[in-house]
A protein has these predicted regions:
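Boundary regions of SH3-family modules and the immediately adjacent low-complexity/disordered segments
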Residues: 11, 16, 40-85, 104, ...
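Short solvent-exposed coil/turn linkers within tandem alpha-helical repeat scaffolds
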Residues: 14-15, 88, 101-113, 128, ...
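SH3/SH3-like beta-barrel fold
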Residues: 24, 37-42
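Heptad-repeat amphipathic alpha-helical coiled-coil interaction surface used
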Residues: 95, 102, 118, 125, ...
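Terminal, low-structured helical/coil segments at or just beyond the last alpha-helical repeat
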Residues: 186-191, 235-281
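Beta-loop motif signature
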Residues: 1-34, 76-85
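Short coil/linker segments at helix-helix boundaries
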Residues: 79-92, 124-153, 178-193, 221-250
């Protein structure tokens, strides 16, 4: 569905209304009657409703350019969700519509991107909720509930070697990050290793610049953290690693925001300005 449709008991607008079918909901056509479709509509939470809807705004496998129509409606819904006075629940509409592109048109050139966008919307919505809970501040990642990885893993499984699979793998790093470092070197050290491993395993990913910066920022933070732990040698080693990572991000991605941020980080490190904690001159 690319519109909100009222579902009726009979193929007549004067008949009893059973409910509404939102954008992106799956409908199975059971019968037709002139300009009407008898459908079984999935309304969420395993709720099914059978009735009649007007044959308008229903995209089927046989619909010409159906994948582009669904994708376009998803993009429009995502735009609505980003607006201050946008349509209510437009983010959920976009999530479902993108998924329908993949589900109904798996061979479409838009399918991989659509599945990733659907997964990303779900990820971001869950992340806002999970990170607002007290458990989000726990030091260890396993002490809090993580975002559901099912759709992200599906992207990686169905479209390996694509940039969408690379981006899905990058998003899943969120579930491995500590909530609060609590001034300990364990978390930033582990996280820097994770980002560096990502760069090594996904060298063509659109997220490489960000991953390099994320690793460099954590290595830079360790410069001061190791000092508080009386580990001067490790502090110097972290400084060298941070400089190397920041230089790589800056030189390889000079036109990106991450490249510029890496250049700033490099400047602070070389100037001896702490990038973590409350250290002052």
């Amino acid at each position: 569905m690319v519109r909100v449709a009222t579902i009726y008991v009979a193929p007549d607008t004067a008949s009893e209304k059973l409910g509404e079918v939102d954008r992106g909901r799956e409908v199975v056509v059971l019968d037709t009657s002139r300009e009407w479709l008898k459908v079984e509509a999935a309304l969420g939470e395993e709720r099914l409703l059978t009735g009649w809807i007007l044959d308008k705004g229903v995209v089927q496998v046989s619909t010409p350019n159906g994948d582009r129509i669904l994708f376009g409606e998803a993009v429009d819904s995502e735009d609505q969700a980003s607006r201050r006075r946008g349509r209510r629940c437009a983010d959920q509409d976009a999530l479902r519509l993108y998924y329908r592109v993949y589900d109904i048109f798996p061979s479409s050139p838009l399918a991989a991107e659509a599945l990733y966008r659907s997964a990303d919307i779900r990820w971001q919505l869950e992340k806002v909720d999970i990170m607002s809970r007290p458990s989000a501040h726990e030091k260890e990642a396993y002490l809090r509930e993580g975002m559901n990885e099912e759709l992200m893993k599906l992207v990686e499984k169905k479209y390996p070697g694509t940039k969408w699979a690379d981006l899905a793998a990058f998003q899943r790093i969120d579930n491995k990050l500590c909530g609060d470092w609590q001034g300990s070197s364990k978390c930033p050290e582990k996280e820097a290793d994770i980002y560096e491993k990502y760069v090594s395993e996904h060298p063509q990913s659109p997220a490489v610049a960000e991953a390099l910066y994320d690793a460099a920022w954590r290595r830079a933070a360790l410069i001061e953290i190791y000092k508080t732990e009386d580990q001067a040698k490790k502090s110097e080693e972290s400084k060298a690693k941070a400089i190397s990572l920041a230089q790589k991000a800056s030189s390889q991605f000079p036109q990106s925001d991450w490249g510029a941020r890496a250049e700033r980080l490099l400047f602070l490190i070389q100037q001896g300005v702490p990038t973590y904690g409350n250290a002052q001159d």
